[in-house]
Amino acid sequence: MARYKDAVCRLCRREGTKLFLKGPKCFTDKCAIEKRNFAPGQHGKDRKAKIVGYGLQLREKQKTKRMYFAQENQFRNYFEKAAKGQGVTGEMLLQQLERRLDNVVYRLGFASARRQARQLVRHGHIAVNGKKVNIPSYQVSVKDEIAVREGSKEMTLLGQIKELTSHTTVPGWLIVDRDNWKGSVSSLPRRDEIQMPVNEQLIVELYSK
């Protein structure tokens, strides 16, 4: 998938569900899908046909990719690795997506949305085990320590993020120290700890054809 540069709210409308790409705004009546719950484009309102079979599987894959800002080749690699591993393929796929550094930064409450977390990582504001990592897709491991770098802690943006994420619930597989902008990975995420509106079995069926 090429990097998406258009308004991300159009992606939610395209998928017909909230992808939670803009943080707190997604939980308000300002969310685009609350105002225009139909596909973007001139004929968006007319696209009401029920999607079944392959189309349903494809849409589930696209939706999941977009939620995590994963590119097509990355997503396929995640699936192939999950399929070769020991465990339930769909759950292991989601586990790899959750272990992306940009997602972990978001889950820890260091960003109000995955898109913002991705930018923080790319701009060099995040360290893993004391070393700067600027690759959003970097896979964290158990016992890894993730932190906002010392030189970045004075950013005005972090004060805004702290206020916006003050009620964020951190999943059980992560430990966070909000005051010092650091956290760690205590375990690999279980399926019941991944609160995402995803039917991973549809994705498994798609790639297994």
Curated annotation (Swiss-Prot):
Annotated disulfide bonds: none
Domain S4 RNA-binding: 99-160
Entry's Gene Ontology molecular function annotations: rRNA binding; structural constituent of ribosome
KW Phosphoprotein (keyword) present: no
One Pfam family this sequence matches: S4
Keywords recorded for this protein, A-Z: Ribonucleoprotein, Ribosomal protein, RNA-binding, rRNA-binding
InterPro entries: Ribosomal_uS4, Ribosomal_uS4_bac-type, Ribosomal_uS4_N, S4_RNA-bd, S4_RNA-bd_sf
GO cellular component: small ribosomal subunit
GO biological process assignments: ribosomal small subunit biogenesis; translation
Record's function text: One of the primary rRNA binding proteins, it binds directly to 16S rRNA where it nucleates assembly of the body of the 30S subunit.
Protein family membership: Belongs to the universal ribosomal protein uS4 family.
Assembly and binders: Part of the 30S ribosomal subunit. Contacts protein S5. The interaction surface between S4 and S5 is involved in control of translational fidelity.
PANTHER family registered for this protein in UniProt: 30S 40S RIBOSOMAL PROTEIN (PTHR11831), SMALL RIBOSOMAL SUBUNIT PROTEIN US4M (PTHR11831:SF4)
Protein name: Small ribosomal subunit protein uS4
Gene for this chain: rpsD
